[in-house]
């Protein structure tokens, strides 16, 4: 008889989903995060998109990821090292393993670890675990692609659509690891794909298959996890991003100051969400203008400041360079101006989907140019 599986009781745990762009890691991570928040955990998430427009499948530069930090108490960051890593292909394992703790549980899709996949991911041999120094006992090696194809063989779906359901198998397995109620996952899927009932049925079936796989092979899993939950106080809850929180903060600041809020902005990733969110709240005294370029966005905000509004312009690194002339105009005119810089990787045009804190030195000197 197999010994009972160890259950790790943790105050907080970090889970990282990773795979190709298009493997649905963002959706799987979002669902798991929502379920965890619903049962009473505090969460902080970090989506990671490849900077390439369309990287080759299975390549190192095309790895997409989603990290969630789950806690019994307050959680303030997405976490650093992960306790559980889901790697849907060899490139994901190669790129993300350095984020793992020494005793992390690693889930892989063995169907995506063929010789060709390993060469694409810059492995020098077929012994990828040995090459990276990974303890095989910490790895849940599952033929996810094969099992999803078998699960949906009679669904009438084409092969491409079937492969898009692999993320749900991984999600089901992770839900088993954390003893999450699948009913919450199913409810999410029914709402998400309400207009596509066939897709709802297929995804539910695959999630259940992943969960059952965990039950059936639990002896090969080093341990499962338990994070204490708390009973939520009844009220209104929402998923909130940094950009949305910034938008709400600006609205609140304008209200407290007794001023109208004006945002003059030019769309630029990853700051555009602030413009999108504020545009929804014209009834709260918010005026937004999508300008023709970065300089115009800043100049329009300066005009609004002169007229007595709480004036804001939003941008990212490349836009700061372009706005510098207008920013100095605000300085010499002694007009208050809020500039939101949602930083991305640089230099020059930079990496729209990556984060970096490298604009600060430039920003400290912008007002000294005049």
Sequence positions of predicted segments:
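Active-site cofactor/cluster-binding pocket
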Residues: 1-257
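Thiamine diphosphate
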Residues: 12-100, 269-362
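Conserved small/polar residues in nucleotide/adenosyl-binding loops
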Residues: 363-370
């Amino acid at each position: 008889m197999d010994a009972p599986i160890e259950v790790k009781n943790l105050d907080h745990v970090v889970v990282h989903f990773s795979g190709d762009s298009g493997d649905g890691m963002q959706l799987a991570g979002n669902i798991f995060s929502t379920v965890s928040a619903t049962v009473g955990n505090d969460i902080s998430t970090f989506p990671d998109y490849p900077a390439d427009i369309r990287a080759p499948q299975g390549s190192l530069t095309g790895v997409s990821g989603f990290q969630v930090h789950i806690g019994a108490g307050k959680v303030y960051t997405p976490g650093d090292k992960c306790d559980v890593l889901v790697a849907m292909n060899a490139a994901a394992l190669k790129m993300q393993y350095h984020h793992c703790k020494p005793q992390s549980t690693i889930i892989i899709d063995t169907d995506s670890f063929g010789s060709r996949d390993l060469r694409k991911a810059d492995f020098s041999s077929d012994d990828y675990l040995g090459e990276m120094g990974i303890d095989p006992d910490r790895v849940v090696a599952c033929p996810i692609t094969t099992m999803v194809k078998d699960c949906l063989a009679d669904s009438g779906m084409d092969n491409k659509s079937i492969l898009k359901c692999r993320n749900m198998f991984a999600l089901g397995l992770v839900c088993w690891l954390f003893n999450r109620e699948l009913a919450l996952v199913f409810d999410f899927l029914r709402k998400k794909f309400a207009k596509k009932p066939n897709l709802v049925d297929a995804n539910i079936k695959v999630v259940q298959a992943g969960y059952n796989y965990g039950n059936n092979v639990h002896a090969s899993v080093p341990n499962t996890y338990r994070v204490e939950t708390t009973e939520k106080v009844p009220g209104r809850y929402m998923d909130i991003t940094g950009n949305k929180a910034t938008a709400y903060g600006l609205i609140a600041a304008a209200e407290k100051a007794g001023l109208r809020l004006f945002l003059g902005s030019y769309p630029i990733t990853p700051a555009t969400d602030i413009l999108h969110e504020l545009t929804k709240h014209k009834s709260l005294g918010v005026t937004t203008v999508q300008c023709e370029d970065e300089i115009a966005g800043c100049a329009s905000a300066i005009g609004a400041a002169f007229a007595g509004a709480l004036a804001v312009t939003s941008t990212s690194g490349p836009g700061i360079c372009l706005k510098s002339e207008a920013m100095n105009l605000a300085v010499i005119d002694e007009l208050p101006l809020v500039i939101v810089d949602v930083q991305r990787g640089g230099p020059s045009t930079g990496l729209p989907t990556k984060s970096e804190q490298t604009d600060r030195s430039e920003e400290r000197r912008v007002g000294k140019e005049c």
